Amino acid sequence: MANEVISGEQLQKVIRDAADLVVSSAGVTLGPEGRPVIMSKSYGGPEVTKDGYKVINNLKPEDEKIAKIVELLNQATSQANEKAGDGTTTATILVGNMIKNAHKHIAAQRSRTKLKSGMKRARDEVVKYIQSVAKKINSEEEIAQVGSISANGNSEIGNKIAEAMNKVGKEGVITVEEGKGLDEFSVSVVQGMVFDRGYVSPYFITNPEKMIVEFDNPYVLLANKKLSSIQPMVPLLETIVRSNRAVVIIAEDVEGEALTSLVLSKMRGSLKACAVKAPGFGDRRSEMLEDIRILTGAKTLVSDDLGVTVESLTVEDLGTAKSIIISKDSTTIVDGGGEKTSIDARVKQIKTQIDKTTSDYDKEKLQERLAKLAGGVAVLKVGGATEVEVKERKDRVEDALHATRAAVEEGIVPGGGATLLSAIAVLEKLSSDDDDEQAGINIVKSALKAPISQIVENAGEDASVITYNLLESKDPNRIFDARELKYVDAFKAGIIDPAKVVRVALESAVSVASVLVTTEALIVDLPTKDNGSPSMMPGGGMGGMGGF
């Protein structure tokens, strides 16, 4: 396939156009007076959203060159969403402004390496500042307040999040599910576990928006060995297909033909499945698989030591769970099908091992297993009058939960873009003997005004006047309330942001902007002419797999 190489001023224009497109599309959603965006969908009616992350992920520019840069810019939002669960629109506005500021320096033939160096020095200083002004939160009341603010002032959501954290601990596992009742909004603690292994392949993803696999009422197949061949699994998988249920395979590894066949079957829609590597190594992996077996109620697991093969299994031997959520880094089992008496006995056994061991390392690992098995999972159930309302409320609760977790982790700072604005004073004191590196520092310094300027403009006010007044006040807690259109104390007014969200937004923006600043060329494929030849896509079932 032929391709085209773009460089120089032509590339710089493509980068600017892509940045302008992303900022103009998502920027209007920022802040309390942010405006909604209507997005067309490939199925169903259009979707109305104020979620900047959704907007950016739905951008599909016709120009292939701009599309490639938009894809790269999306990494800033994805990083922010993945690490902090929020701050995606702020990251977008920051990176767009940095690119705009960098262009004039690139045109002036400044050293791109030095620009990048200056940007990173500025980033490090601002991160230190954010951490220094962050206020830690500890009480259930403070957690409820942060949750309420994160949910646009909804105190009920804040109180439920605080209740859930109180039940399973600040580090505990909390999930959000769709409830059945019209006004249902409840918190319950069920048997469950989370471990730090994710899907083996991203092709298993069922929710592309969140980049996760979600299954309700799946089977759980456990194997303390590598699974490489699909043939021994076919009879069992065919039975699972007929039951119209999903299966999560947790094994030492799933590779080769087995992995390929599972992925292809999932992509064809014939089998709902996901493969996950088992947590731990050696004997610890065996023990953790046994924990999962007891939690899910599986009768046995595939193991050479036990003489149990995949061929010998039936669905009655498999474990179950009410739901399983799998990301690229973790797996959460909610309400496993195991008997409470069996789980309690296993917990008691682990406690005995903790008391008997003389190794600090072994004790630590046993305590980790105990926490995973005994801690349980808090489930927030959210109901509504319609499917659309339930989904919207569920998304809102999930966003508030992410933000609250981030706040508990690193504290809170003045919101509304004020913390980044006040960090300008820190960069005023940062200088470099190298003019090009100083230009890089100035790129970040100028961008720090962008988020609050966008928030103010969305409220219909003059951003230059507001930012000037805030900078002149030299009070980091003084912010502009874009809803009430007045200056207030951030903490008294409850307009705060999780420090982690602000930090990650800045770090993600500098990361992506510095890549684009130093990029010299872009290679894109040229469109091929359709010669009318028939499609070569394979059809039908796969030999030896029973057509599942």
From Swiss-Prot:
Q: Mutating I205T leads to what result?
A: In strain: Danny/horse/Oregon
Xref: Gene3D superfamilies: GroEL (3.50.7.10), GroEL-like equatorial domain (1.10.560.10), TCP-1-like chaperonin intermediate domain (3.30.260.10)
Matching entries from SUPFAM superfamilies are given as:
GroEL apical domain-like (SSF52029), GroEL equatorial domain-like (SSF48592), GroEL-intermediate domain like (SSF54849)
Reactions catalysed? ATP + H2O + a folded polypeptide = ADP + phosphate + an unfolded polypeptide
| GO cellular component entries | cytoplasm
Q: Which Enzyme Commission number(s) are listed?
A: 5.6.1.7
Q: Which UniProt keywords apply?
A: ATP-binding, Chaperone, Cytoplasm, Isomerase, Nucleotide-binding
Per UniProt, subcellular location reads as: Cytoplasm
Its job: Together with its co-chaperonin GroES, plays an essential role in assisting protein folding. The GroEL-GroES system forms a nano-cage that allows encapsulation of the non-native substrate proteins and provides a physical environment optimized to promote and accelerate protein folding.
The protein's matches in HAMAP family, at most eight in alphabetical order, are given as: CH60 (MF_00600)
Task: State the family it belongs to.
Answer: Belongs to the chaperonin (HSP60) family.
Task: Identify this protein by name.
Answer: Chaperonin GroEL
Q: Which gene encodes it?
A: groEL
